[in-house]
């Protein structure tokens, strides 16, 4: 009862702030998020668990097959064991295939019945939809843009209408707003394209701003259980050599926070993919090939 009274008091305080004329409009998503947390009095996960209890739990579920979130690319899934609450970063220079890969992964996860929210801070939803159509139909992006698809190809798009995949523009928005929208949509997975474009007020220093954004995305994943997939730009010198985690633009915090990092690079028409951080599996060549015409990644034949 005491905990419930405290939660109500906290909720009322936040509600008064929300209707206060002095409260900035951009602060409302963060207040909305805090109000939801205030009413949830049963999410505390900080209590101790003995190793014996943890061992019993492990043995009890020994015969259950792990339920990882699949990407749809078998070579990636062999090593990238994504679970709810992970923070997965896909880094690359412009035109290395970051957006194409993220859309393909989002579609693959939606096909599994996962509710996926895709937040784009750079590209409008209609342009992303064109890339997604090309990817799913194995059709040239030019045919999609010029609207020269056959009726047979158009008929094959019917399944896409049933996917729980939602795309929206997030230009100029911050992490609190993204979190509030994802919670409103009951998302299992959210994509952000891309991290360095997220707007956070209050920090004039770019390094500190990106550091705070990465920390906030990591906390979002951990506190909500949503799988967060964030695209990230690489520094310009990454174009001249095989990229590494240190090339993640403007902050080393991204490397610190991420559960896994996949870096994409290109040399002319040849594309490379490498897992450079992976808490739950091996690192190294991810074994992916990119067809820019079809906007589609496939597993390399070995």
Identify the role of each PLM range.
Residues 1-60:
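Short, small/acidic-rich helices and loops at N termini and domain boundaries
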Residues 88-90, 117-119, 168, 229, ...:
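Hydrophobic/aromatic beta-strand patches that form the interior of the parallel beta-sheet core
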Residues 79, 95, 149, 212-302:
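Phosphate-binding/switch region of NTP-binding enzymes
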Residues 194:
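Walker B catalytic acidic pair
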Residues 8, 70-73, 126, 151-154, ...:
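Amphipathic alpha-helical transducer elements in NTP-driven molecular machines
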Residues 77, 108-186, 200-201, 286-292, ...:
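Cytosolic-facing regulatory segments adjacent to core modules
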Residues 89, 189-191:
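Structural motif
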């Amino acid at each position: 009862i005491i905990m419930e009274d405290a939660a109500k008091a906290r909720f009322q305080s936040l509600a008064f702030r929300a209707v206060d004329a002095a409260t900035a409009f951009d602060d409302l998503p963060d207040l909305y998020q805090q109000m939801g947390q205030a009413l949830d009095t049963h999410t505390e996960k900080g209590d101790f668990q003995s190793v014996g209890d943890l061992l019993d739990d492990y043995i009890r579920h020994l015969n259950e097959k792990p339920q990882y979130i699949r990407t749809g690319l078998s070579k990636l899934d062999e090593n990238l064991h994504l679970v709810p609450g992970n923070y997965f970063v896909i880094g690359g220079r412009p035109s290395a295939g970051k957006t194409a890969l993220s859309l393909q992964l989002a579609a693959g996860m939606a096909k599994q019945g996962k509710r996926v929210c895709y937040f784009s801070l750079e590209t409008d939803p209609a342009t992303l939809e064109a890339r997604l159509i090309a990817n799913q139909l194995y059709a040239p992006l030019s045919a999609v843009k010029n609207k020269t698809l056959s009726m047979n190809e158009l008929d094959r798009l019917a399944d896409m209408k049933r996917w729980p995949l939602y795309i929206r523009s997030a230009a100029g928005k911050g992490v609190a707003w993204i979190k509030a929208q994802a919670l409103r949509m009951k998302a299992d997975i959210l994509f952000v394209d891309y991290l360095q474009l997220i707007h956070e007020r209050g920090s004039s220093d770019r390094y500190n701003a990106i550091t705070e954004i990465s920390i906030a995305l990591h906390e979002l994943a951990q506190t909500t259980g949503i799988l967060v997939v964030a695209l990230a730009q690489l520094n310009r010198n990454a174009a001249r050599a095989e990229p590494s985690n240190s090339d993640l633009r403007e902050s080393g915090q991204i490397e610190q926070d991420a559960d896994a990092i996949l870096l994409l690079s290109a040399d002319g028409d040849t594309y490379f993919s490498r897992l450079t951080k992976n808490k739950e599996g091996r690192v190294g060549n991810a074994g992916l090939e990119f067809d820019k015409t079809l906007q589609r990644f496939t597993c390399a034949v070995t």
